[in-house]
Protein backbone atom coordinates (compact mmCIF):
# COMPACT_ATOMS: atom_id res chain seq x y z
CA UNK A 1 0.00 0.00 0.00
CA UNK A 2 1.34 3.42 -0.98
CA UNK A 3 1.69 6.24 1.53
CA UNK A 4 -1.54 8.16 2.03
CA UNK A 5 0.30 11.43 1.36
CA UNK A 6 1.43 10.23 -2.10
CA UNK A 7 -2.10 9.18 -3.01
CA UNK A 8 -3.48 12.53 -1.78
CA UNK A 9 -0.85 14.46 -3.74
CA UNK A 10 -1.77 12.58 -6.92
CA UNK A 11 -5.48 13.33 -6.36
CA UNK A 12 -4.65 17.01 -5.89
CA UNK A 13 -2.72 17.00 -9.18
CA UNK A 14 -5.68 15.35 -10.93
CA UNK A 15 -8.02 18.08 -9.67
CA UNK A 16 -5.57 20.77 -10.80
CA UNK A 17 -5.41 19.26 -14.31
CA UNK A 18 -9.22 19.19 -14.51
CA UNK A 19 -9.47 22.78 -13.26
CA UNK A 20 -7.09 24.20 -15.89
CA UNK A 21 -7.92 21.84 -18.79
CA UNK A 22 -10.25 24.23 -20.64
CA UNK A 23 -7.98 27.27 -20.21
CA UNK A 24 -4.97 25.22 -21.31
CA UNK A 25 -6.88 24.04 -24.42
CA UNK A 26 -7.85 27.62 -25.35
CA UNK A 27 -4.32 28.98 -24.86
CA UNK A 28 -2.87 26.14 -26.90
CA UNK A 29 -5.32 26.83 -29.75
CA UNK A 30 -4.27 30.51 -29.74
CA UNK A 31 -0.62 29.53 -29.62
CA UNK A 32 0.00 31.57 -26.47
CA UNK A 33 2.75 29.38 -25.05
CA UNK A 34 4.03 32.13 -22.76
CA UNK A 35 0.68 32.13 -20.90
CA UNK A 36 0.72 28.33 -20.72
CA UNK A 37 4.18 28.50 -19.18
CA UNK A 38 2.83 30.77 -16.41
CA UNK A 39 0.16 28.26 -15.37
CA UNK A 40 0.91 26.08 -12.32
CA UNK A 41 3.20 23.15 -13.08
CA UNK A 42 0.78 20.63 -11.63
CA UNK A 43 -1.90 21.75 -14.11
CA UNK A 44 -0.05 19.88 -16.86
CA UNK A 45 -1.44 16.38 -17.57
CA UNK A 46 2.12 15.17 -18.21
CA UNK A 47 2.85 15.32 -14.48
CA UNK A 48 0.11 12.82 -13.63
CA UNK A 49 1.17 9.31 -12.66
CA UNK A 50 -1.09 6.34 -13.13
CA UNK A 51 -1.78 4.84 -9.71
CA UNK A 52 -3.65 1.70 -8.75
CA UNK A 53 -7.07 2.59 -7.32
CA UNK A 54 -6.92 -0.37 -4.95
CA UNK A 55 -3.40 -0.07 -3.50
CA UNK A 56 -2.06 3.27 -4.78
CA UNK A 57 0.95 1.53 -6.36
CA UNK A 58 2.51 3.65 -9.15
CA UNK A 59 4.45 0.88 -10.90
CA UNK A 60 3.04 -2.00 -12.93
CA UNK A 61 -0.10 0.06 -13.64
CA UNK A 62 -2.62 -1.23 -16.20
CA UNK A 63 -4.55 1.73 -17.63
CA UNK A 64 -7.44 -0.32 -18.97
CA UNK A 65 -8.32 -1.60 -15.49
CA UNK A 66 -6.92 1.30 -13.40
CA UNK A 67 -5.03 -1.10 -11.15
CA UNK A 68 -1.57 -2.55 -10.67
CA UNK A 69 -0.58 -5.94 -12.05
CA UNK A 70 -0.63 -7.40 -8.54
CA UNK A 71 -4.14 -6.20 -7.70
CA UNK A 72 -5.31 -7.18 -11.20
CA UNK A 73 -4.05 -10.74 -10.77
CA UNK A 74 -5.67 -11.02 -7.35
CA UNK A 75 -9.06 -9.71 -8.53
CA UNK A 76 -8.95 -11.75 -11.76
CA UNK A 77 -8.33 -15.00 -9.86
CA UNK A 78 -11.32 -14.23 -7.64
CA UNK A 79 -13.45 -13.53 -10.75
CA UNK A 80 -14.21 -9.96 -9.69
CA UNK A 81 -13.26 -8.35 -13.03
CA UNK A 82 -16.02 -8.82 -15.63
CA UNK A 83 -14.91 -10.38 -18.91
CA UNK A 84 -11.50 -11.50 -17.63
CA UNK A 85 -10.66 -15.17 -17.32
CA UNK A 86 -7.47 -17.17 -17.14
CA UNK A 87 -6.06 -17.90 -20.56
CA UNK A 88 -5.32 -21.44 -21.71
CA UNK A 89 -4.26 -22.69 -25.15
From Swiss-Prot:
GO cellular component: cytoplasm; small ribosomal subunit
Keyword Protease among UniProt keywords: no
InterPro entries, per database record: Ribosomal_uS14, Ribosomal_uS14_bac/plastid, Ribosomal_uS14_CS, Ribosomal_uS14_sf
Pfam families recorded: Ribosomal_S14
Keywords: Ribonucleoprotein, Ribosomal protein, RNA-binding, rRNA-binding
Gene3D superfamilies: 30s Ribosomal Protein S14, Chain N (4.10.830.10)
Molecular function terms, GO-annotated: rRNA binding; structural constituent of ribosome
Alphabetized PROSITE patterns for the sequence: RIBOSOMAL_S14 (PS00527)
Keyword Magnesium in annotation: no
HAMAP family reported for this sequence: Ribosomal_uS14_1
Cited NCBIfam families: PRK08881.1
Assembly mode: Part of the 30S ribosomal subunit. Contacts proteins S3 and S10.
Family: Belongs to the universal ribosomal protein uS14 family.
Function: Binds 16S rRNA, required for the assembly of 30S particles and may also be responsible for determining the conformation of the 16S rRNA at the A site.
This protein's name: Small ribosomal subunit protein uS14A
Lineage summary: Bacteria, Bacillati, Bacillota, Bacilli, Bacillales
Amino acid sequence: MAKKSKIAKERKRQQMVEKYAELRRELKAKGDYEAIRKLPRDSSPTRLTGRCEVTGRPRGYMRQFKMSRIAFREYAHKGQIPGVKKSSW
